[in-house]
Each structure stands twice: as C-alpha cells, then as structure tokens.
Amino acid sequence: IKEHGPIAGERVLQMIHPVIKALSAIHKTGIIHRDISPDNILVNQKEELVLIDFGSARAERQTMTQSMTVLFKRGYTPEEQYRGRGNWGAWSDVYSLCATMYFMLTGIVPNESIERMIHDDIKLLRDMPHIRLSATEEDAIMRGMAVKANRRFQSMESLEAALYESRGWVQRVVLYFQHKSKSVLLAGGAVVLAGVLAVCALLTMGGKLSAIGS
C-alpha cells in the first residue's frame, strides 16, 4: 500500500473474506489472535492474504495477567487490550481487522483507540468518495472499529453478514471453506501451529510474501 496506494473497495472485500472465514474458525476453537495488523497479513504472488504471527494468541476464557504477552500496534489495537483486565474476545479481533481494512482502503493508519476514547474525530469512510463501497459496507467497517466493544460486531460471522450478504458472497464462500473448516475445528488449539506451519511451507516452497502495508 505504501508503494502502490490504497486498494479498491471491492478488491479489499474479496481479499479479506478468506481471513474473516479463517478467524471465524479459529474463534470457534476459543482462540483469539489479538495482534491483527497490516504487518501480520502477508500477500502471496496470487494476491491471496495470509494471516501470520499467533505469538499473542490466547484462549478467550483467559484473563489478562502481567505474565501474558501484550502487544500494542498503534491504530490497530482495541482499547480493551490496553487494560490489565480488559474484556477481550472475538470483538477485539473484529476491531483490529476492520482497522486493517480501513488502512487498505484509505492508506491512512486509524486514530489510536485510546485517543478516540477522549476525542473521536476519525474520518468516516462515507466522507471519502474514492472508497466506492455501499453505505452499508462502509458503515459495517466503521461499526467494527467502534471504540466501545459492546457497539461492535461481536463475532466474525456477524461482520461477514454485514459486509457480504448484500453481494450474495456469504454462501458461496461458506461452501468453499466447508470441507476445510471441519479439520480446523477438530484441531482445536493446534490451529495456531497449523497456521504457522502453512506460512513456513510457503516460504520453503519459494512463495514470495510481502506485508500488505509495504
């Protein structure tokens, strides 16, 4: 994005959809990524997105303690992850993913969530004519970036429905992923390791990967 500029709205939706499906499957195992940002989403030679870096992933039922790894990515970390006993969950990944989509669409790093708690003057997608998404889609991304967790979509499934149902994309992608998602769900916590191994395999095979923010 730094090299070529923002990505067209429909193309962003196409590229990010498999990531939403993957996160939905991961969340069903009770695992939250907690570190989604452009730095951790790579693009391969087929322009497919690969989510990496599960080093901060945690079981949803865990509470934050001083011994747990906490990473803050300016513009992409929801406010609850800054608090020692923040109530984080799937909605936290929703925030980070929608903030990443915002960057892909605009080339602008979103305002920091903690700063937005004091004064929220983030520029809305609907005020940027070049985005070329429907009002429903733009509002869905901004809702996913709501500062307060209870105002966001509470799951990747609800975010997906808001973004894709009007385009008729949801069922088609669900069918495509169905045979793969079963093995992911059965794997439980091993899904994290599987994701890391998948990236390693791409690198070993010589697949060229670059961060979407580069």
PLM features: what roles do these ranges have?
Residues 43-47:
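Activation-loop N-terminal segment of eukaryotic-like protein kinases
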Residues 32, 37-38, 42:
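Canonical protein kinase catalytic loop motif
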Residues 75-167:
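C-terminal lobe helix-coil module of Hanks-type protein kinase domains
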Residues 15-16:
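Activation segment signature within eukaryotic-like protein kinase domains
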Residues 50-53:
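Pre-DFG segment of protein kinase catalytic domains
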Residues 19-31:
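Protein kinase catalytic-loop region centered on the HRD/HxD motif
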Residues 1-7:
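AlphaC helix of the protein kinase catalytic domain
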